[in-house]
Regions:
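Gly/Trp-centered helix-boundary motif
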Residues: 1-119, 123, 127-128, 135, ...
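Transmembrane helix-loop junction
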Residues: 52, 130-131, 161-165, 198, ...
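Amphipathic cytosolic juxtamembrane alpha-helices at the membrane-cytosol interface
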Residues: 94-109, 113, 133-141, 201-205, ...
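Residue-level hotspots within pore-lining transmembrane alpha-helices
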Residues: 105, 147, 151, 186-190, ...
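Non-cytoplasmic
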Residues: 154-158, 162, 181, 191, ...
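Transmembrane alpha-helical segments in multi-pass inner-membrane proteins
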Residues: 161, 165-167, 172-175, 179, ...
Length: 315
């Protein structure tokens, strides 16, 4: 009767991912966060379509919406109307809704690419340090300590100030996006690296690693075919939790005029411009601020739920 049910049907086991999905489906808060994340991605992807239907081009001026004496939008609460769902910017009358929608593209693109870079660097460094140990582990761990102690914000401001308008065959927004991805990703990899190193230290003592060694498997094969698949869950969890941190960092850099430059819309850049007008045009600051808040909250809720689903012991 082993392996058979009462009616003779075979009992099928469930994989880690099936079990995790079952747990995640029961977590309504995480599902809500995941739904918002998916919605934000769709907004970023289809920004031109959304703006064409509901707004105006993000760089288009609308001086007819501006009071010529006060230089602020006509009407209540920053000129909110059916044509301008989030109101208009002071001075030039650009559509705040369109700029918030297009700003999601920059924020999410930089956050995802920077997270990908940091995960690649951190995973490779963490696996090598945890598997080999000894002086290799010491060297990589001390390198992580140096990066973690580095004043990242000051470095970003200094580097962005000396980078020319054209470099490495890139220019304009493309160059600034690449610069932000490099700065954020290159200096945040130790956070992932430390976590993966700890997991690798535990895995290298497991029986399947000893079995692979006894069968003559070389270190690269053990690293990439035995250890990495077993590290997929923590990599996915902490990547999801790193994305909102990178969104905040990109917004901070744009707020300080270090990131993508105007007139290209970014959430942090809009907040920076809004500091001069928040008393008389609060919508200019409110909506990009809400966009950052909702995005970061959604990613954190989904990441926490994903962590609980894949590793219930972390609760």
């Amino acid at each position: 009767m082993s392996g058979q049910g009462r009616e003779g049907t075979a009992i099928q086991g469930r994989s880690l991912w099936q079990i995790a999905w079952g747990r995640l489906k029961r977590d309504r808060v995480a599902l809500a966060g995941g739904g918002v994340v998916v919605g934000l991605m769709l907004v970023a992807i289809f920004a031109p379509v959304i703006v064409a239907v509901l707004g105006h081009p993000p760089l288009e001026f609308h001086y007819d919406k501006i009071d010529p004496d006060l230089q602020v939008p006509r009407g209540h609460f920053g000129g909110i109307s059916p044509d301008f769902l989030f109101g208009a910017e002071p001075v030039n009358g650009r559509d705040v809704f369109s700029r918030v929608v297009y700003g999601s593209r920059i924020s999410l693109l930089i956050a995802f690419l920077a997270t990908l870079l940091s995960v690649l660097l951190g995973t490779v460094a963490g696996v090598i340090a945890g598997y080999f140990g000894g002086w290799i582990d010491t060297l990589i761990s001390r390198t992580m300590d140096v990066f973690l102690a580095f004043p990242l914000l000051l470095f970003a401001i200094a580097l962005a100030g000396v980078v020319p308008d054209r470099a490495f065959g890139l220019a304009g927004d493309t160059l600034r996006i690449a610069l932000m991805v490099f700065i954020i990703g290159f200096f945040s990899w130790p956070y992932i690296g430390r976590i993966i190193r700890g997991q690798a230290l535990s895995l290298r003592e497991r029986e399947f690693i000893d079995a692979a060694r006894s069968l003559g498997a070389r270190s690269p094969r053990i690293l990439f075919t035995e250890m990495l698949p077993n590290l997929a869950a923590p990599i996915l969890i902490y990547s999801t939790l790193l994305i909102p941190t990178n969104i905040l960092f990109e917004a901070a850099l744009s707020f300080l005029s270090v990131g993508v430059r105007p007139p290209t819309p970014t959430w942090g850049g809009m907040l920076s411009e809004a500091t001069h007008w928040f008393q008389i045009a609060p919508n200019f600051m409110l909506f990009p601020g809400l966009a950052i808040f909702i995005t970061v909250l959604a990613f954190n809720l989904f990441g926490d739920g994903l962590r609980d689903a894949l590793d219930p012991r972390s609760r």
